[in-house]
């Protein structure tokens, strides 16, 4: 163990294991969650060929939503950029009504007394900055009590944004 000048133990940065390879990136639609087959999109197109409503985004395969999963895409100011079809139903909103609203108008941390887990706002900001970590938070719809959802929060792109998948 390293020691500081005064003989006390010192902290040091521990590097991740070299064998921990990051999960591969996959594409998905920001509205329906469908994952297009590689090469299925016309050259330069970013619009989903399945629903024709969402843009194609990328995220880690272990976090990216599956078709019909409930998820939101947020920017670093905690504003909603996209809402999936399943999240519209779950949160009782429509995408045009939800876009550009603050995340706390749709989702809240599930309990103020909980000390474990990540702070929802901090997790979203880190993901929207392009941080490679996957975080989780327990949330509830802002207009409903008694419902708890686990949210997986990670970065997505092409430009850094936060992907919040509700399980």
Map each language-model feature to its residues.
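Sensory/regulatory domains in signal-transduction proteins
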Residues: 2-40, 44-47, 52-54, 68-70, ...
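PAS-family sensory domains
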Residues: 61-64
């Amino acid at each position: 163990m390293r020691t500081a000048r005064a003989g006390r133990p010192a902290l040091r940065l521990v590097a991740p294991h070299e064998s921990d390879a990051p999960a591969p990136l996959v594409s998905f639609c920001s509205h329906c969650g469908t994952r297009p087959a590689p090469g299925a999109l016309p050259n330069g197109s970013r619009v989903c060929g399945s629903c024709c409503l969402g843009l194609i985004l990328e995220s880690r395969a272990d976090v990216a939503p599956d078709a019909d999963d409930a998820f939101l895409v947020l920017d670093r100011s905690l504003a909603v950029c996209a809402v999936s079809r399943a999240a519209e139903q779950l949160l009782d909103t429509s995408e045009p009504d939800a876009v550009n609203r603050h995340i706390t108008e749709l989702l809240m941390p599930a309990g103020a007394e909980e000390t474990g887990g990540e702070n929802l706002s901090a997790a979203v900001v880190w993901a929207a900055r392009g941080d490679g970590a996957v975080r989780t938070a327990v949330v509830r719809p802002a207009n409903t009590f008694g419902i708890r959802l686990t949210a997986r929060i990670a970065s997505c792109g092409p430009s850094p944004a936060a992907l919040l998948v509700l399980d």
